[in-house]
């Protein structure tokens, strides 16, 4: 009987360990266009897997379909979390093809890009409502965060009780104002960083491990 009990205990411990590890958590990277979402996704993926998620560009709506990088394991301060990064298209209330003409695009290409960007917004919202288990919300610290889109998205995230980490990106720029982002969403902690330069990424990784583990 003692041997049987010991065997059951051993099996139980192994089973608990397997279920404790679970599936990687799907963490969506959200924010307005050109906030640096893909730059951040690539920074995280390269730091922990050596691979990139997708191309980066100064032209708005470079990411027009959600891209996923699976099984990214982040370790900090004794905590470990494995996540699937979902780099989502920038969310906005209006996509105008004329915006792309300013970047020397032909009209046909600009119209196509604006259509794809609009579809990308819908896809990003679907991921938010149905599939992600946590959110990294990226804001450009050189821009005013008090916008309809930011307020709406943060409200949706909160209504779904999703853990959210707000990042004030582009602190490498002289005009960056971290405090305006902290003031816009005082109910959440704001972490400054430069995804492009890698500034303060250690703290970002600490918070990812803390928020999503």
Per-region residue spans from a language model:
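Conserved C-terminal guanine-recognition region of P-loop GTPase G domains, centered on the G4
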Residues: 112-188
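Conserved G1/Walker A P-loop phosphate-binding module
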Residues: 2-103
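Conserved nucleotide-binding/hydrolysis micro-motifs of P-loop NTPases
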Residues: 62, 90-92, 142-144, 170-174, ...
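A solvent-exposed, charged loop/short amphipathic helix patch at secondary-structure junctions
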Residues: 99-114
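Canonical P-loop GTPase G-domain recognition
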Residues: 170-213
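Charged, alpha-helix-enriched surfaces in structured cytosolic catalytic cores
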Residues: 35, 39, 64, 148, ...
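Conserved P-loop NTPase architecture
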Residues: 1-19, 24-28, 33, 146-147, ...
């Amino acid at each position: 009987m003692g041997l049987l009990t010991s065997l059951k205990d051993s099996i139980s411990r192994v089973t608990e360990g397997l279920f404790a590890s679970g599936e990687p958590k799907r963490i969506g990277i959200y924010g307005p266009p050109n906030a640096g979402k893909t730059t951040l996704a690539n920074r995280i993926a390269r730091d922990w897997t050596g691979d990139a998620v997708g191309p980066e560009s100064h032209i708005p709506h470079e990411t027009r379909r959600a891209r996923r990088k699976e099984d990214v394991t982040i370790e900090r301060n004794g905590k470990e979390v494995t996540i699937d990064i979902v780099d989502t298209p920038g969310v906005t209330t209006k996509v105008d093809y004329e915006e792309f003409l300013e970047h020397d695009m032909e009209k046909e290409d600009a119209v196509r890009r604006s259509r794809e960007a609009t579809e990308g917004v819908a896809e990003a919202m679907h991921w938010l409502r149905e599939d992600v288990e946590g959110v990294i919300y990226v804001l450009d610290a050189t821009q005013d965060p008090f916008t309809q889109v930011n307020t709406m998205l943060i409200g949706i995230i909160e209504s779904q009780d999703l853990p959210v980490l707000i990042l004030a990106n582009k602190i490498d720029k002289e005009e960056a104002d971290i405090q305006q982002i902290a003031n816009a969403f005082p109910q959440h902690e704001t972490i400054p960083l430069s995804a492009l330069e890698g500034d303060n990424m250690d703290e970002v990784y600490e918070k990812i491990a803390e928020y999503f583990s």
